[in-house]
Amino acid sequence: MSNSPFQQEVAKRRTFAIISHPDAGKTTITEKVLLFGQAIQKAGTVKGRGSNQHAKSDWMEMEKQRGISITTSVMQFPYQDCLVNLLDTPGHEDFSEDTYRTLTAVDCCLMVIDAAKGVEERTRKLMEVTRLRDTPILTFMNKLDRDIRDPMELMDEVENELNIACCPITWPIGCGKSFKGVYHLYLDETYLYQTGKGHTIQEVRAIKGLNNPELDAAIGEDLAEQLRQELELVQGASHEFDHQAFLQGELTPVFFGTALGNFGVNHMLDGLVKWAPAPMPRQTDVREVSAQEDKFTGFIFKIQANMDPKHRDRVAFLRVVSGQYEKGMKLHQVRIKKDVVIADALTFMAGDRSHVDHAYPGDIIGLHNHGTIQIGDTFTQGEDLKFTGIPNFAPELFRRIRLRDPLKQKQLLKGLVQLSEEGAVQVFRPLANNDLIVGAVGILQFDVVVARLKSEYNVEALYEPVNVSTARWVECHDAKKLEEFKRKSEQNLALDGGDNLTYIAPTMVNLNLTRERYPDINFRKTREH
């Protein structure tokens, strides 16, 4: 295979997202990753609001003026010989289906765990999503500068709860006030921790070898001996690193450190660029597309709307799968069978929203969207194919939506269907009545929908509680059995925005009983876009 400039560009791309429970330290680790990638000169700390440190890195702060906060969505930075694309997954309040779908656009994930707490609920959910594509996972056990749980116990919990084998790459020496550093099992080096160096890249002292007298002198004989004994146990009880198992999502390399103290993040980044895959092939409804192909293909995984009614622009995020994007090129939008000239795609380099001239597989570009682009749309240079694996997820929160002005029913329905195509929310129309039920994954989605209905469709809507706790898409290969099911379960059936049959259950117990009663019916948690 000739190593053309194009192939070199593809080979150096690494595209990943960070998954964590709120407060496990995702914002801090994002900052430190950017610091090591020299994307920002100095990281602010989230704690030091009163000090001269900014609450976050400056450009993140600028994003707070509620325009399209696009720069925090995709950040590109160089690290060693690679070019890394970090896709942000929104945190607490902004948690939505976007968070899930972003994970379908990456080739690898970094799971950040608060080592004082272990595996938490949001992490479990996000890991379930990575399982849809067996995404490779690296793990960073964070907050070693605080008192943490036993490291072996933490790894056991990850293995048991998330069903993935753990392979420690670094191992902590103490924690909290007595945190001394980490030992790298594969380089046979100990790195010593210094406090108070969180916002700059520090020179870390490395001591080669476990039996080096320097180690005893640096951390004390007792701790050094304890470390040797611990490592004997660890090496006996844990998995060896196996690159193939990692690439198949079966094994996760585990790193220990403190993002706030800026320690251990670089070991994880070294592992990421060394082991994470370059842009991967993607399945379509016709064939598999390799990143090395010279014709451009890509898919839309997220649409970001503007909260400012003065600017209606929305940006559609496109993951480049193959070929090269060049400014002004003509692309074929497969779903609507139309050619479009893309003159002003956006890129996201270290926090600047700027126009892009070139993009390669693994890169994310932003397309201006005036309502013609939907999630799951495929763009090609003419070939008629559609990328698969961009799912809708069953919502977990439901509200009935009501109009202040009943004469605007038509506009309401139109608005909701369009917003559901964009992925802002899901809409369900029960077969048994004229209600409109809105479903979301994150609570903020409801507020966004009401605001956008008002500003874009001139519809004033309000919510009421509704007796729905979960929804599943319904499939059955036997038309007769499906008809019988529809007849008997009409009270619990609805059509979603794309007219797909959906079972809306008042309780999980109801759903489980219905499943048992109708074993031939498939109740699905995800549905292809």
UniProtKB/Swiss-Prot annotation:
GO terms for molecular function: GTP binding; GTPase activity; guanosine tetraphosphate binding; translation release factor activity, codon nonspecific; translation release factor activity, codon specific. Disulfide bonds: none annotated. Increases the formation of ribosomal termination complexes and stimulates activities of RF-1 and RF-2. It binds guanine nucleotides and has strong preference for UGA stop codons. It may interact directly with the ribosome. The stimulation of RF-1 and RF-2 is significantly reduced by GTP and GDP, but not by GMP. The gene is prfC. It comes from the Bacteria. Its main location: cytoplasm. HAMAP family: Rel_fac_3 (MF_00072). The keyword GTP-binding applies. One of its GO terms (cellular component) is cytosol. Pfam families: EF-G_D2, GTP_EFTU, RF3_C. Keywords: Cytoplasm, GTP-binding, Nucleotide-binding, Protein biosynthesis. Residues 11-280 form the tr-type G domain. It is found in: Cytoplasm. InterPro entries: EF-G-like_DII (IPR053905), EFG_III/V (IPR035647), G_TR_CS (IPR031157), P-loop_NTPase (IPR027417), PrfC (IPR004548), RF3_C (IPR032090), RF3_dom_3_sf (IPR038467), RF3_GTP-bd (IPR041732). GO terms for biological process: regulation of translational termination. GTP binds at residues 20-27, 88-92, 142-145. This is Peptide chain release factor 3. Belongs to the TRAFAC class translation factor GTPase superfamily. Classic translation factor GTPase family. PrfC subfamily.
